[in-house]
Amino acid sequence: MEKNNLNEMRKALLEAASLLQKSAKVGQGVDEAADMLMKDAIYTTTSGAFAQREHLDTQIGDITKRNTPFLDRVPKVAANGKTHEWDMVTALGSNDTAVGECGTPLENDATITRYSAQIKTYATSVKVCDLAQWAASDYFDLMNLHLEKGMRKILQDVEKKIYYGNHDGSTPNDFTGLYKLIADYAGAENTINASGNAISQTYVDNAIQVIVDKGGSPTHMFMGAKDLRDFAALWANKVVYNDPSAGMTFGYNVARFMSFAGPIEIVLDPFLTASNSPNTPNTDIFIVTMDEIALAQTEPMYRLPVYRALDLAETQTVVWNIVLELRVPQWTVCVKNLG
């Protein structure tokens, strides 16, 4: 039985190699040949029988993925100058860093640090030992699976930190989010305290008025599920959405708010929750001029070379050095403490 399987596998590989050789001459069929090689070569032996392995990275990604709407909209720009770029790079070697100059980060750890004002290094690492490599057979897929989830974790960390960062100021060299940047640099009127009351059009209009009075033109309003639900309820008796062609679809559309200063996109962000807010159990919303906000980076998220330690384990790391730039703080408002 095993001999027959080996013969079949050898035959399939020869056919794929022949097709690959032919495609090199005519410029066609490369993808088909590669698929054949992959299908017939990725096998492992279990009790003498052949079985093709199936990886669940796609399914796991679907289960764990959460949207990051702010990162999807904010411009990604290069570091603004040599000093800025140098600070980002040297953050790798600073104290209590995610990635030491002469070491490796902790396994499966997402840490945050920075070297100078507003600089932060986000990193995640995966360490796979020989035993896990043997158990997984094609262990590079196992490592990549971990890294994919690590990269998703980095994006989620950044999404949360963009809003709140180190809002209490207990660590001067930590990442500062919109909440504290507004409080520190935009003026008292740019933080509107709802004092536990629910969101209302008055709060939103007052926030827009502050931005317009200072020369801005707000473009986006970010809020969590609770506040979006309350805000939508305000219009339930005014704007009814009905799509006869879609059967029983009904409700109200809150995709945009037509304010006195023009249309503002309403964005639901799953990371704007009471547990993340400094005003928990209450929440906050942010009205921003997105054109004047940027995420500076030395380069896009990248991988460090694989490191093999003395314990015969391999470590691979993903790093992202970024800084949140709020170019005109006066054009951003936080309505905080919404009940």
Model regions and ranges:
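Residue microenvironments linked to proteolytic maturation
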Residues: G150
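Stable alpha-helical elements in mature extracytoplasmic
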Residues: M143-H146, I154
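Sequence/fold signature of self-assembling virion shell proteins
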Residues: E2-T44, A49-F50, E54, D141, ...
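Second-shell loop/turn segments in exported
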Residues: Q133-F140
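Structured segments of extracytoplasmic/periplasmic soluble domains
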Residues: K153-K161, V210, K214, L234
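Short, glycine/acidic-rich hinge or "gate" loops at secondary-structure transitions
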Residues: E159-F175
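Assembly/oligomerization interface modules of large self-assembling protein complexes
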Residues: M38-K127, L147, S170
